[in-house]
């Protein structure tokens, strides 16, 4: 492993320990976001959200989709209503608009896997490190695809979805729930994210949080959200994992 790469990781761990007050980082589990981390689905979600909001007269960009990723659909809709209509959206409006978005998304091609993610998850499994998924999605069909594409690598009962929490990302509740399901302390886990709100949630939960920039955002967007480390792709994450897990 390159010396400067190792030093970067060591420095990030030292900063995390100094900030949190933990004595060590003893990794026993990893919590993955889903869209943009497991599946290359964010371009499809971005297109679906832009089309949906356009139908109801709300200007929305693909960058905004990426910046809002991790937030529940209801929260995303409500925020846009406040910005553009100066009021909260009703539950009925949220359900109707999300139904439109889901309909558009379901007509799109099925997304493939993020390159290299299978190797990352298998490395963890081979080293007896627990794995789970923490997602703002609540669609059962998507969760079923995790089981289909990651055969035996994830336990559905350990997954955290929008249906499990009251406050989604950027609040820490999703990752605190993940820790609870894995029965781990914050310094015994990692969060792997691709979006600012998810990174904020992981950091707020006190977990060492890694950003992998698989989308259209700048690396600085993930750093500004508080990521302890930011990588360009899963290959870099795989290279770093032994240093993080075995340090």
Label each residue range with its predicted role.
Residues 1-28, 118, 122-125, 138-247:
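Asp-based, Mg2+/Mn2+-dependent phosphohydrolase catalytic module
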Residues 113, 134, 167:
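Residue-level marker of regulatory loop/turn positions in helix-turn-helix DNA-binding domains and
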């Amino acid at each position: 492993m390159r010396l400067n790469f190792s030093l970067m990781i060591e420095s990030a761990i030292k900063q995390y320990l100094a900030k949190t007050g933990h004595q060590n980082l003893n990794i026993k589990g990893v919590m993955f976001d889903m869209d943009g981390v497991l599946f290359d689905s964010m371009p499809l979600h971005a297109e679906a959200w832009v089309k949906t909001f356009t139908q109801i007269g709300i200007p929305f960009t693909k960058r905004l989709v990426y910046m809002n990723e991790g937030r529940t659909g209801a929260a995303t809709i409500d925020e846009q209503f406040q910005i553009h209509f100066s009021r909260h959206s009703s539950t009925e409006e949220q359900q109707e608009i999300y139904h439109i978005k889901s309909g558009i998304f379901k007509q799109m091609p099925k997304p493939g896997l993020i390159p290299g993610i299978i190797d990352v998850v298998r490395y963890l499994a081979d080293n007896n490190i627990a794995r789970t998924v923490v997602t703002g999605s609540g669609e059962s069909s998507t969760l079923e695809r995790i089981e289909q594409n990651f055969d035996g690598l994830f336990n559905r009962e350990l997954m955290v979805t929008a249906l499990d929490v009251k406050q989604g990302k950027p609040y820490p509740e999703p990752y605190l729930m993940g820790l609870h399901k894995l029965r781990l302390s914050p310094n015994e886990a990692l969060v792997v994210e691709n979006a600012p709100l998810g990174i904020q949630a992981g950091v707020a939960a006190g977990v060492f949080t890694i950003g992998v920039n698989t989308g259209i955002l700048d690396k600085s967007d993930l750093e500004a959200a508080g990521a302890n480390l930011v990588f360009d792709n899963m290959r870099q994450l795989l290279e770093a994992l032994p240093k993080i897990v075995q340090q």
